[in-house]
Amino acid sequence: MLVMAGLGLYDELDVTLKTVEFAKKVDKIYAEFYTAILTGTTIEKIEKTLQKEITVLNREKVEYETNKLIEEAKEKDIMFLTAGDPMVATTHVDIAVEARKKGIEVIILNAPSIYSAIGITGLQLYKFGKTTSIVFPEPNYFPETPYDVIKDNLSLGYHTLCLLDIQTDKQKFMTANEGLSVLLEIEEKRKEKIIDENTKVLVVARAGSIKPGLFYGKIKDLIKHDFGTPLHCVIILGKLHFMETDALKYLFENI
C-alpha cells in the first residue's frame, strides 16, 4: 500500500489527524521537500508529531528512484509525505499513477495547500486563471512564461497566482521583491505594457501560518518592502468585484 499524504503549509500543527493515524500503521515513511517546504517547523518536530522516523529523499531520489519506492510498496505499507497537498506536483501524481498501474493500493490524504490558503486574500477563487511560477534567472535561462500567463489571464479579467522559485538544496527561496523584479525585467524586454511599476499587486507571505503577511500596493513601493521570512507569493490582479475591493481595503496592509 502507498499512502500519499500532505503536511500542509507552515508547521507540524498543519498535519491532519488522519495522517497521524495512518503514520502509526505504515511500515516506513518517506518525504520530499524540494517542491515545497514547511518553513515554520523541522523534520524532527514532524517526526515527533507522527511518532515515527522519516527518510527524506532529495530531488534525484524522487525523480529517478520512484520505481524502487513503488516496488517497496508492493510488499510493505509505505507513506510518502510532501509539503502542501500531495497531489499538486506533477511528480507526485506520476508516483500515484505508476503505483496504481502495478496494482498497488493508493490512498491519498489531502492537506492545506497554497490553492486553499489563498482564500485568506478575500479574492474570489473562481476568478483565478492559470497559475504560473517565477524562477531565478540563470545564464542563458530567463523564461518569460510568467509574463505570457499574466497577459492571457488579464485578457479574461482573471487574477494570476505567481509561485516563487524554491531551491531547498541551496536554502534559497525567491522573495516577492525578486519575483517582481523579474516581471519588470521581462516587461522591459517585451514592452507590451502588461505590467509596470505602477501596477497594483498583492504579496502574500507565510500563507498557512497564524500571522501571514498580506500586502497590497504598487510594484514600485512593494519592491522596496521587507516582507519577512519566506515563503512568499505574488498575485497579479484581474478585474475586481466590489467585495474583493473591500477585502483589499480591510484585510491587507496597504503599502
From Swiss-Prot:
One of its GO terms (biological process) is methylation. S-adenosyl-L-methionine binds at residues 9, 85, 88, 113-114, 164, 207, 232. Belongs to the diphthine synthase family. One of its GO terms (molecular function) is diphthine synthase activity. Pathway: Protein modification; peptidyl-diphthamide biosynthesis. NCBIfam families: dph5 (TIGR00522). The keyword Glycoprotein does not apply. It comes from the Archaea. Homodimer. This is Diphthine synthase. S-adenosyl-L-methionine-dependent methyltransferase that catalyzes the trimethylation of the amino group of the modified target histidine residue in translation elongation factor 2 (EF-2), to form an intermediate called diphthine. The three successive methylation reactions represent the second step of diphthamide biosynthesis. It is an enzyme of class 2 (transferase). Keywords: Methyltransferase, S-adenosyl-L-methionine, Transferase. It catalyses: 2-[(3S)-amino-3-carboxypropyl]-L-histidyl-[translation elongation factor 2] + 3 S-adenosyl-L-methionine = diphthine-[translation elongation factor 2] + 3 S-adenosyl-L-homocysteine + 3 H(+). Its EC number is 2.1.1.98.
